[in-house]
């Protein structure tokens, strides 16, 4: 069986206009996949050079396949049908290592056609590393490497204003573009680079903050033989991902034209502020996950897919989203509903086995950041507590007993909560404290909740009532009236 390369698999090749820091699965099934579609359907005509930003020889370089690889996008489409779509990606030309090919790396800045910089260097990538110097070959941190590359560009083109870059980081931190820009400016000042360079950074370059959303499941180790048989070739860089994707970019309106999104619309939004989209994702996608997990798991289910195929649990989650989360969010209702509909479809994806216990990690913090804001906003708006979000809190407290149908399961959270719950549930079993007292102790933890939740009218009582029903009748019976 042949391995992918451009000699045996000839096809389009595009001039290099994009630098990408990061060789991982996410960017390949997200950014490079979108660039490939735009190259095929428009005159974007842009090839990608992947820069490996860390010193490692694993995985091997994408250049061993001349930049070619296959994405397999699978899940439920807009009509709810299971689809699996294989695509040979031709947008990447080559990969270089900033460690072993430093001169080649700097040379990227000399190419007048270069226009975009994308990156995903993990959440820890956009950070300051003390001791990074201008003359390091290379510096340790990504922002320092980028500063050096930008200075190379500035110098080579004598500060020409039409030679700046559009820089689009995809790292999962808030306002990633602003964070990256601040670090580049910090290095520029620390290295005493000329004032003209700092002005050029501001005038000629755009640092765009983003929100990225797609579950990328990566190399399908268990199915490789079958998939390669279907494809008819060997591909060491196969990359799988879900059908859904969303790319929100906070940047100039002209970006839509520059990326040719006006000619071939993708699910890419160019917006003035990513904040409401971030809130929407946290509240609906992450919030639904967090509400679902303790309820579904204690109802005897193990994966998100099983939960969504269970009529009662699915109804509980959908009602929580549409009746209790969406009404308190600050975006047009139709936008929120179409996003929610995509979310429930993603949860049903038959190709992804998402274990409930793995999502349960750090559930106390997740509840505070993802559900509590909507619970409190609903109480404020209506004068009554949202029934399902409140029930989810009771289910979460019950979950920390660590026992289902007489069998124990691992609970993962910080040591404080694990010890606290062990003590509280032990006292509850020994009848030293009652349910209401247990709930009050949990809700009074100001350090965790950042407020005293026992002061929210009726919250202790309602959570305690729900918890009592869960303990007496089991989760199935307890949740039924809310389905």
UniProtKB/Swiss-Prot annotation:
InterPro entries according to UniProt: 6-PGluconate_DH-like_C_sf, 6PGD_dom2, Altronate_OxRdtase, Mannitol_DH_C, Mannitol_DH_N, NAD(P)-bd_dom_sf
Recorded metabolic or biological pathway in which this protein acts: Carbohydrate metabolism; pentose and glucuronate interconversion
An example Gene Ontology biological process: D-galacturonate catabolic process
Pfam families, alphabetized: Mannitol_dh, Mannitol_dh_C
Enzyme Commission designation: 1.1.1.58
Domain of life of the source: Bacteria
Top enzyme class: oxidoreductase
Gene Ontology molecular function: mannitol-1-phosphate 5-dehydrogenase activity; tagaturonate reductase activity
Ligand binding (NAD(+)): 18-29
Keywords for the protein's UniProt record, in alphabetical order: NAD, Oxidoreductase
Reactions that this protein is recorded to catalyse: D-altronate + NAD(+) = keto-D-tagaturonate + NADH + H(+)
Cellular component annotations (GO), alphabetically ordered: cytosol
Entry's family note: Belongs to the mannitol dehydrogenase family. UxaB subfamily.
Annotated protein name in UniProt: Altronate oxidoreductase
């Amino acid at each position: 069986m042949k391995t992918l390369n451009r000699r045996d698999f000839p096809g389009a090749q595009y001039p290099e206009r994009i630098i990408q820091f990061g060789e991982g699965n996410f960017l390949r099934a997200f950014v490079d996949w979108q660039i490939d579609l735009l190259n095929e359907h428009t005159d974007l005509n842009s090839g990608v050079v992947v820069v490996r930003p860390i010193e490692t020889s694993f995985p091997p370089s994408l250049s061993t396949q001349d930049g070619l690889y296959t994405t397999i996008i699978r899940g439920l489409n807009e009509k709810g049908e299971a689809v699996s779509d294989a695509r040979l990606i031709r947008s990447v030309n080559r990969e270089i290592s900033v460690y072993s090919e430093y001169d080649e790396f700097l040379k990227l800045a000399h190419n007048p056609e270069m226009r975009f910089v994308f990156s995903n260097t993990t959440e820890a990538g956009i950070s300051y590393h003390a001791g990074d110097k201008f003359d390091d070959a290379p510096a340790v941190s990504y922002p320092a490497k980028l500063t050096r590359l930008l200075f190379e560009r500035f110098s080579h083109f004598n500060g020409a204003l039409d030679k700046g870059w559009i820089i689009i980081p995809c790292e999962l931190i808030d306002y990633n573009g602003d964070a990256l820009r601040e670090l580049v400016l910090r290095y520029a000042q620390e290295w005493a680079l000329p004032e003209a360079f700092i002005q050029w950074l501001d005038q000629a370059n755009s640092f765009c903050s983003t929100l990225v959303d797609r579950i990328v499941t990566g190399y399908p180790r268990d199915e490789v033989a079958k998939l390669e048989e279907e494809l008819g070739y060997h591909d060491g860089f196969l990359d799988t991902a879900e059908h859904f994707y969303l790319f929100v970019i906070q940047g100039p309106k002209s970006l839509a034209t520059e990326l040719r999104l006006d000619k071939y619309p993708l699910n890419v939004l160019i917006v003035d502020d990513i904040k409401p989209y971030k809130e929407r994702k946290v509240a609906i996608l992450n919030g639904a996950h967090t509400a679902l997990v303790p309820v579904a798991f204690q109802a005897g289910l193990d994966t998100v897919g099983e939960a969504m195929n269970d009529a009662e649990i699915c109804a509980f989650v959908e009602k929580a989203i549409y009746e209790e989360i969406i009404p308190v969010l600050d975006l047009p209702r139709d936008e929120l509903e179409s996003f929610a509909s995509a979310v429930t479809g993603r949860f049903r994806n038959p190709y992804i086995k998402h274990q409930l216990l793995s999502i349960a990690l750090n559930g106390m913090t997740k509840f505070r950041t993802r559900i509590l804001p909507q619970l409190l906003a609903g109480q404020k708006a209506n004068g009554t507590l949202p029934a399902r979000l409140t029930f989810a809190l009771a289910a979460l407290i019950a979950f920390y007993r660590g026992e289902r149908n007489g069998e124990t399961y691992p609970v993962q959270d910080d040591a404080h909560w694990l010890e606290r719950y062990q003590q509280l549930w032990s006292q509850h079993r020994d009848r030293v404290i009652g349910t209401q007292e247990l709930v009050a102790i949990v809700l009074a933890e100001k350090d965790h909740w950042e407020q005293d939740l026992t002061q929210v009218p009726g919250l202790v009582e309602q959570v305690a009532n729900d918890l009592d029903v869960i303990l007496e009748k089991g989760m199935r019976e307890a949740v039924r009236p809310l389905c």
